[in-house]
């Protein structure tokens, strides 16, 4: 319950910030163009708070925080007294109206740059993209990428950490190949390797793009040595103690902790013959994992924690810049996100990315809660990502969105007169139906992931 409330609160904060930024873009440019703004509302429904300024603009925070709007004086909506007609939105030039409409998405992009600017000043912790293991018969194995290799760039774009690698790989969905620049860790002897992506079975909502290529990142080492044994657990009942090293399971040598975890998970209630080493002496024990529910079937659980050797400092990286360099890096990062968002939306249309990858408010709320819990340097990039997506989607030439309004203005500029009210009304209805269908699909995907 606490987790749900945290996710909800983080989601409401994120939504409130991004909607305010978007609507403020419309509001600010409208004021600069001499348009009278009658209401600036964050949310819909019953007003929880309201205030009116000296220019007559009413500011509102409403009950339902799922959107917002800026209401401008407009003769098409209501009669306007003659002395105020020059302040009406519909009486402004096509260029001014286009600027007002485009200002919302532009504000979202500027906010993303600002968020990344703050993050790069604070410092972004990351891990150098050094390969730990390569899965047999994988795409990475076929390209002869070896453990200990550092991934320096993807198609010429530098990748200082694993997050940068993932961002570039996601953009390669549907491509036939990509070129990765690699070098032995600690060396500048670079070479290019080509990955064949024609049979790359990667689904963004189900797996990590790096692991889908058969690459396991170099991370903290987990040894088959027990750090802690929970009281009254299956491990405690079997006689296991902190400091024990598990040597064999059912006669098979154990070299990786993950192998032991899988054996325990797959054998609830079944006996596992262990050979361990305790203070240099061999010892044989029988372990019977307890059963607990998980993903529709029973899984084994024994109540132990392994010894973890932290990642050495030379594998860690912190991206931190001064105020001016941070602006350059933040702008570049935002531009990369904008290109990725457009690319992914295009691939959704062409079918290279499946529609079940669409995410709705539940997935966004989970992301908000998770990143907020990790800290500000993770929450701000999340806000930047959603802000960029909000800006790009609003520019789609779909009636009811900013892009649809811009399309009507472009037609008006070309033909020398506005699109008829009848045509606009019909297009708004079609656009609303399409938007509701997309939102329904996104919600369906969200619930199917629960």
UniProtKB/Swiss-Prot annotation:
Inhibition and activation profile: Inhibited by Zn(2+) chelator 1,10-phenanthroline.
UniProt keyword Metal-binding, yes or no: yes
Catalytic residues as annotated in Swiss-Prot or TrEMBL: 23
Effect listed in the UniProt record for changing residue 214 to R: Weakly cuts RseA without previous DegS cleavage. Stronger cleavage
Matching CDD domains: cpPDZ1_EcRseP-like, cpPDZ2_EcRseP-like, S2P-M50_PDZ_RseP-like
Membrane-protein topology: Multi-pass membrane protein
Outcome when changing residue 23 to D: Behaves like wild-type in vivo, slight reduction in RseA cleavage in vitro
Effect of substituting residue 246 to Y: Cuts RseA without previous DegS cleavage
Keyword annotations from UniProtKB, A to Z: Cell inner membrane, Cell membrane, Hydrolase, Membrane, Metal-binding, Metalloprotease, Protease, Repeat, Transmembrane, Transmembrane helix, Zinc
Effect of residue 22 to F: Loss of protease activity of RseA and signal peptides, does not complement deletion mutant. Binds substrate
Outcome following mutation: residue 23 to A: Low basal sigma-E activity, sigma-E not induced. No proteolysis of RseA
Record domain PDZ: where: 127-220, 222-309
Effect of residue 394 to C: Decreased substrate binding, retains some proteolytic activity
The name this protein goes by in its record: Regulator of sigma-E protease RseP
Domain-level remarks: The 2 circularly premutated PDZ domains act to negatively regulate protease action on intact RseA; mutations in PDZ 1 (PDZ-N) have a more deleterious effect than similar mutations in PDZ 2 (PDZ-C). A 31 residue insertion in PDZ-C (between Val-261 and Met-262) domain inhibits protease activity, whereas deletion of residues 203-279 alleviates the PDZ-inhibition, allowing cleavage of intact RseA.
Lineage: Bacteria, Pseudomonadati, Pseudomonadota, Gammaproteobacteria, Enterobacterales
Residue spans crossing the bilayer: 1-21, 104-124, 376-396, 430-450
Binding-site residues for Zn(2+), renumbered to this chain: 22, 26
Loss of function: phenotype: Essential. Depletion experiments lead to cessation of growth, elongated cells and limited lysis, as well as decreased amounts of sigma-E. Not essential in an rseA deletion strain, when sigma-E is overexpressed or in ompA-ompC deletion strain. In the latter has severely decreased growth at 20 degrees Celsius. Accumulation of an RseA proteolysis intermediate.
């Amino acid at each position: 319950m606490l987790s749900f409330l945290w996710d909800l609160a983080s989601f409401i904060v994120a939504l409130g910030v991004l909607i305010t930024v978007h609507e403020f873009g419309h509001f600010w440019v409208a004021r600069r163009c001499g348009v009278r703004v009658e209401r600036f509302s964050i949310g819909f429904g019953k007003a929880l708070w309201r205030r009116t300024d000296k220019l007559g603009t009413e500011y509102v925070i409403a009950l339902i925080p799922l959107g917002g709007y800026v209401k401008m004086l407009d003769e098409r909506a209501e009669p306007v007294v003659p002395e105020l007609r020059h302040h009406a939105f519909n009486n402004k030039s096509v260029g001014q109206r286009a600027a007002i409409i485009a200002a919302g998405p532009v504000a979202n992009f500027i906010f993303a740059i600002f968020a990344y600017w703050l993050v790069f000043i604070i410092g972004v912790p990351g891990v150098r993209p050094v390969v730990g293991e390569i899965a047999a018969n994988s795409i990475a194995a076929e390209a002869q990428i070896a453990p200990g290799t550092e991934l320096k760039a993807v198609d010429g774009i530098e990748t200082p950490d694993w997050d940068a690698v993932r961002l570039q790989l996601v953009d390669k969905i549907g491509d036939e190949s990509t070129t990765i620049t690699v070098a032995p860790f600690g060396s500048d002897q670079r070479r290019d390797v080509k990955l064949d992506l024609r049979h790359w079975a990667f689904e963004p909502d189900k797996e990590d793009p790096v692991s889908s290529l058969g690459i396991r990142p170099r991370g903290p080492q987990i040894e088959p040595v027990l750090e802690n044994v929970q009281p009254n657990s299956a491990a405690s009942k079997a006689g296991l103690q902190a400091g024990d090293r598990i040597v064999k399971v059912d006669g098979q040598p154990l070299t990786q902790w993950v192998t032991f975890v899988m054996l325990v998970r797959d054998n609830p209630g079944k006996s596992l013959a262990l050979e361990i080493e305790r203070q240099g002496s061999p010892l044989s024990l029988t372990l019977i994992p307890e059963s607990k529910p998980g993903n529709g079937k029973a899984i084994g659980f024994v109540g132990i924690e392994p010894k973890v050797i932290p990642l050495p400092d030379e594998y860690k990286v912190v991206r931190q810049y001064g105020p001016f360099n941070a602006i350059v890096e933040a702008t570049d990062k935002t531009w990369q996100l904008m290109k990725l968002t457009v690319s992914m939306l295009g691939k959704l249309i062409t079918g290279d990315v499946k529609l079940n990858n669409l995410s709705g408010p539940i997935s966004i709320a989970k992301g908000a809660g998770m990143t907020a819990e990790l800290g500000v340097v993770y929450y701000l990039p999340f806000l930047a990502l959603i802000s960029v997506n909000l800006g790009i989607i609003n520019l789609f030439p779909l009636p009811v969105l900013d892009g649809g309004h811009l399309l009507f203005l472009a037609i008006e500029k070309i033909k020398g007169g506005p699109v008829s009210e009848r045509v606009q009304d019909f297009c708004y209805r079609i656009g609303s139906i399409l938007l509701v269908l997309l939102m329904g699909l996104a919600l369906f995907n969200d619930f199917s992931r629960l």
